[in-house]
Amino acid sequence: MKFFALFIQRPVATTLLTLAITLSGVIGFSLLPVSPLPQVDYPVIMVSASMPGADPETMASSIATPLERALGRIAGVNEMTSTSSLGSTRIILQFDLSRDINGAARDVQAALNAAQSLLPSGMPNRPTYRKMNPSDAPIMIMTLTSDTFSQGQLYDFASTQLAQKIAQTEGVSDVSVGGSSLPAVRVELNPSALFNQGVSLDAVRQAISAANVRRPQGSIDSSEQHWQVQANDEIKTAEGYRPLIIHYNNGSPVRLQDVANIVDSVQDVRNAGMSDGKPAVLLVISREPGANIIATVDRIRAELPALRASIPASIELNIAQDRSPTIRASLDEVERSLVIAVALVILVVFLFLRSGRATLIPAVAVPVSLIGTFTAMYLCGFSLNNLSLMALTIATGFVVDDAIVVLENISRHLEAGVKPMVAALRGVREVGFTVLSMSISLVAVFIPLLLMEGLPGRLFREFAVTLSVAIGISLVISLTLTPMMCAHLLRAQPTGKQQRIRGFGKVLLAIQQGYGRSLNWVLGHTRWVMVVLLSTIALNVWLYISIPKTFFPEQDTGRMMGFIQADQSISFQAMQQKLKDFMKIVSADPAVDNVTGFTGGSRTNSGSMFISLKPLSERSETAQQVITRLRGKLAKEPGASLFLSPVQDIRVGGRQSNASYQFTLLADDLAALREWEPKVRAALSKLPELADVNSDQQDKGSEMALTYDRETMARLGIDVSDANALLNNAFGQRQISTIYQPLNQYKVVMEVAPQYTQDVSSLDKMFVINSNGQSIPLSYFAKWQPANAPLSVNHQGLSAASTISFNLPDGGSLSEATAAVERAMTELGVPSTVRGMFAGTAQVFQDTLKSQLWLIMAAIATVYIVLGILYESYVHPLTILSTLPSAGVGALLALELFDAPFSLIALIGIMLLIGIVKKNAIMMVDFALDAQRNGNLNARDAIFQASLLRFRPILMTTLAALFGALPLVISSGDGAELRQPLGITIVGGLVMSQLLTLYTTPVVYLYFDRLRSRFSKKPLMRLE
């Protein structure tokens, strides 16, 4: 009593305390960062190594394997995958969520240093690493286009100036430049002219290397002056290389221009980029794991004026994609839902109380509780994201409950003629324990969530803490500010003035009277009610088993990723045309706003596309519906496939695959893997539960396999190294010299002329000059024939691996897809030497699925323990928890009705319902116990009286919670697909629970009271 009186009798102190909470919350709100979701990125580090000209199998065995053995010893690595392709190896290390990425980076560097001695000596550079996840969608894509500058020059500006500056921005991990390559002097050799002049390709290479050197020449010092010695030892342009003498033939000089075409071009001509149908160079910007997208994008945009000023005016620098607008729009929608929820909740209170003064009290309590939460969010390092704002939206219906219970009870005493100050003290004292029980038991629901490990635990920690803090502040406000305002604002009013909204008052009274009559009948037919209650328990089990499940609601972020996979033997020219064709088809879709893409590099049969959709206000289809519409058009393109996936704010794993979900096959024997992977892929392609099934196994590339006749070579005086050098010089785009410029270094690239790289018959024109100076055609000592060769070799851990990727068809669920995959693997009879496992998001989904029921049971057990402690009873918590089955049925039926799968968001809705619906039972049980103890009523009369007495606050708090969640259900803007499952679950559960628990709770109370009376004579107790 003294505690409550302290605040009621000191209104100034209570008001100032409230203002302090509000002010600190406003400051905290202004300091909070903005992000789409809580920080749940796994620490991922990418290791890169290169050895130009090496085939994929050589890269895998000589580079990937030694590095994997060293990196695999690092503590905290939970997944290590590698891909080795022509001349390059990439190893992805995914660490535990708890691992600090900077500490992991130091361990990676130490492992690379330790493995250096095991790597081939021919590597031009040491392996490097970056703190980035290659599977994460870029946060921004910029394009450079120009009508006057070449693609190589644009690439030079992009890599030398723009990429360097952008990479220095806080939060940026990598800036990948695509669509071309650095400028270079290309020497395109004519094999026939070389043969006629008796000059080998290697002689040309040596002559160019010797003619372009950069060495210190020293200085000259006299007694009075100092001179630096500088010679024209470098050749920097194609014009300078043309007259270079490379050989003398019978005393006549053979110049480079006599046997080759020398042009200013690019290092790798097998690269192409496009944006909206025009050639373009792309700047693909990725963030560090854990970096805030909005803050990073804002920093990059702030640099845009300086970036544009650093390049010529005839070059256009545009932003083709930016992930931040849809994130901001989604957060704006959540904030709008929050405001609507507050307004609806206050409207509910006004309709019930029918008094402006009375409504003002919860109208103050709700925003104070919500605003005060921002302080705790800032101190905990949280952000304003979809989940934390959804927590506040849902909290609107919770935080008003405490104020309503206190306000309604004080109003009841005022209507009985008690003075305001006495009514406030008496009213808050009577329901103080009830409010405390409701709040503590609601917070207890989130304890299992806070203790949950892995990605789901990290994902919902902010949600749980934010909601718990809001409830805690609401508890304080309802026991301090609310009774103080009641004592000073409320007055007993004449009956006529109370009924300002007469229609609603009459309806409410009629409902209450009808409830009393129906409850009286129910209490006389308790067996039927128990049958209904037991039926809801069974129905819960059946609905949970049958409902489709998924990991996380598929978001429409307005961005899509496209991955092109063509025939493994396709040429670069044909692949470039495929890119153009696919971009044309996608660009023609009315929902598409912008398309960029590129192809080339080490894998000539693949390409990437980045698609921006129009804002939701300008299109009627979701991203998934756009993909479904495009899928039919894209299937008509022969020789290649384009796989489209909507960009998600959360993606698990470091694999860069062609679809959203992955199933990995592992084997110690590469031959077994190559035998079974096509069979598994073919079986999965037939499953209707899957779409866009594809594989990263690339073992059917075309190669020309040469067989050396070593005896003939020995007789002719030719070494294998001479023959290999010939092939590398002719077809390897070999970088044979370096041109040094102030801002960058450029290469001299040697290769046969383009017409000779497009026909296998060019091998007949190749020759080697032996030790006797004779020109020996390649065909004299080698034979060749077509064969298959891998374009890439993949590992997971130290095992050979192949990842089959898939998407879901429109309306499909991940649970149905994973179950179908497991059935297919069983029916195929895959041997034990080939192991199958889900990876990435699919793996986390399966792990989460196993723990969902345990999580719900843990929440129920926690609430039971808390209630048992509060009531000093084993029985009364069971009465209160009997409200849960009906809520579960309502939630699951609502999800089925709206065709929404059961996701992590829906799981949180179920957890919230555990906390919400038991409030009704707490109010009934608490008043019934008080009536039995102090009013000398029997159990039936006590629970009947309590049910009628608390009917109005029960109805009010339920409607407040329902209307607080309603804006999430009806939302239709950006991010609605993330909010709707939570709202649907809560609204469905509340409606069903309200209809049933008003009857089941009194019946269960009576049953347990009879059991208590039969087995124990201990008097009823309630903690004060």
Curated annotation (Swiss-Prot):
Regions crossing the membrane: 12-32, 333-353, 360-380, 387-407, 431-451, 463-483, 528-548, 853-873, 875-895, 897-917, 953-973, 984-1004
Membrane topology: Multi-pass membrane protein
Gene Ontology MF terms: xenobiotic transmembrane transporter activity
Key words of the record: Cell inner membrane, Cell membrane, Membrane, Transmembrane, Transmembrane helix, Transport
Principal cellular location given in the protein's record: membrane
InterPro entries documented for this protein: AcrB_DN_DC_subdom, Acrflvin-R, Multidrug-R_MdtC
Gene Ontology CC terms: plasma membrane
Localization per record: Cell inner membrane
HAMAP family tied to this protein: MdtC
Family: Belongs to the resistance-nodulation-cell division (RND) (TC 2.A.6) family. MdtC subfamily.
Matching NCBIfam families: PRK10614.1, RND_permease_2
The protein's assembly and partners: Part of a tripartite efflux system composed of MdtA, MdtB and MdtC. MdtC forms a heteromultimer with MdtB.
Name by which UniProt lists this protein: Multidrug resistance protein MdtC
Lineage per the UniProt record: Bacteria, Pseudomonadati, Pseudomonadota, Gammaproteobacteria, Enterobacterales
